[in-house]
Amino acid sequence: MKKIKTYENKNILILGLGKSGFSVAKLLLKLGAKLTLNDKKDLSNDDRAAELGKLGVRVISGYHPVEIFDEEKFDYLVKNPGIPYENPMVEKAEKLDIPVITEPEIALNVSEAPYVCVTGSNGKTTTVMLTQRIMDHNLSKNGGHAYAVGNIGVPISEVVEKATSKDLLVVEMSSFQLLGVTDIKPKVAAIVDIYNNVHLDYHKTFDNYVEAKLRITQSQDQDDYFIANFDQKNILEKELDKTKAKVQTFSETDKTADYFIGDEYLESKDDHHIMKISDIKIPGIHNQQNCLVAIAISKLMGADDSDIQYALSTFTGATHRLQYVMTYNDRKIYNDSKSTNIEAATVAIPSFKEPEVLIAGGLDRGFMFDSLVPLFKKHVKSIVLYGETKYLLADAARKAGIKDIVIVNTLQEAVPRAYELSEAGDVILFSPACASWDQFNTFEERGDFFVKFIKELKTK
């Protein structure tokens, strides 16, 4: 870890505990900062808050003390990425011209290990896991390691102390995190895709969302590389305007891109066959595109075809992202709880050749589901719907001509009904197409409950 002086003796307010708040607090203490931690939740019985208190952090919880800004001067506010900028503490800090940053800004600037960054509306976690797997296989030959960190669930601050110049950080960046960075310079940055109707409750407009994503490349220069989706022409134009890095592209079908999906192989434009598609374990065209991004990043960082082929042929999928759960009575069951928007369901549903019994539903964000009608018509034989959006999704299912439409209240009710509708040889797919917050705290919690309910089928 680099011993930088940026935060030494600085008075820093951390807003929001969480995983990243806890980790960045410990990191900042080692960098010599004076810390105050504030969380609207009551932390009086929180073990992590107690640990920070013993280390000298002032902990204020249960409310937001906006008046604290009148009592003392802060040099930085480090914001939990999920906290909106309309939060009164953030608004006050911005009014006073106090820099509002997020954990990656601090952690990446003290990292001895080189790093690459990946963002996107869908597919970024799988891409990060694939890249980490390829690069770990490559770096281990010389005693190094690749670490998957960031939005994937492992705070960067947790890893930077042990990561050395022989290692690599593969960083998943959300749009929330990217809004709070001003000076990160990844050797390779990649945007897997950008879709509308994603996090607009946070970013307000699609243009704001795109601008947040583009911050991943804003500090890159001609010595760096930027990986862009050749098929999203409207976004590509904005990316090319923004970046100063050298650009490589990937495409589902366009052979003028640097990397593309061929008939039998994942290929590069110099006619090089990198990986046989049939050897890739994770299903779906979208996952083949994720593989292309991971290949592009890894090749730039020194991996060869043998590293790629080993990693991609042994990777069985990220949890909650078209995750294979089990085969039960000749039904293959998949958990795609990360499908928190229509676009994610759009790529999940066509991933299988077998007839599908689909479970969907969740938080109502005011979207219509008519774009799913053609996919329902082609791939879905029966559908079980729950949550706030169940009737909206039922309308789309009726338009698709699906005869078996079952409406229930909860996911727990949905699982056995889906099994009853299925036959040997079918796929039971949980791809909600909606956020989880009507009934669950996170998509991870929702996915864990789905897997639990599926396993309970075997005991009945």
UniProtKB/Swiss-Prot annotation:
EC category name: ligase
InterPro entries per record: Mur-like_cat_sf, Mur_ligase_C, Mur_ligase_C_dom_sf, Mur_ligase_cen, MurD
Matching Gene3D superfamilies: Mur ligase, C-terminal domain (3.90.190.20), Mur-like, catalytic domain (3.40.1190.10), NAD(P)-binding Rossmann-like Domain (3.40.50.720)
Disulphide bond pairs: none
Annotated GO MF terms: ATP binding; UDP-N-acetylmuramoylalanine-D-glutamate ligase activity
Organism, scientific name: Lactobacillus johnsonii (strain CNCM I-12250 / La1 / NCC 533)
Cellular location(s): Cytoplasm
GO terms of biological process kind: cell division; cell wall organization; peptidoglycan biosynthetic process; regulation of cell shape
Enzyme Commission identifier(s): 6.3.2.9
GO cellular component term of the entry, any: cytoplasm
Superkingdom of the organism of origin: Bacteria
Major localization class: cytoplasm
Family label: Belongs to the MurCDEF family.
Keywords from the UniProt entry: ATP-binding, Cell cycle, Cell division, Cell shape, Cell wall biogenesis/degradation, Cytoplasm, Ligase, Nucleotide-binding, Peptidoglycan synthesis
Residues engaged in binding ATP: 120-126
Pfam families: Mur_ligase_C, Mur_ligase_M, MurD-like_N
Pathway membership: Cell wall biogenesis; peptidoglycan biosynthesis
Catalytic activity: UDP-N-acetyl-alpha-D-muramoyl-L-alanine + D-glutamate + ATP = UDP-N-acetyl-alpha-D-muramoyl-L-alanyl-D-glutamate + ADP + phosphate + H(+)
Identification of the protein by name: UDP-N-acetylmuramoylalanine--D-glutamate ligase
Protein's job: Cell wall formation. Catalyzes the addition of glutamate to the nucleotide precursor UDP-N-acetylmuramoyl-L-alanine (UMA).
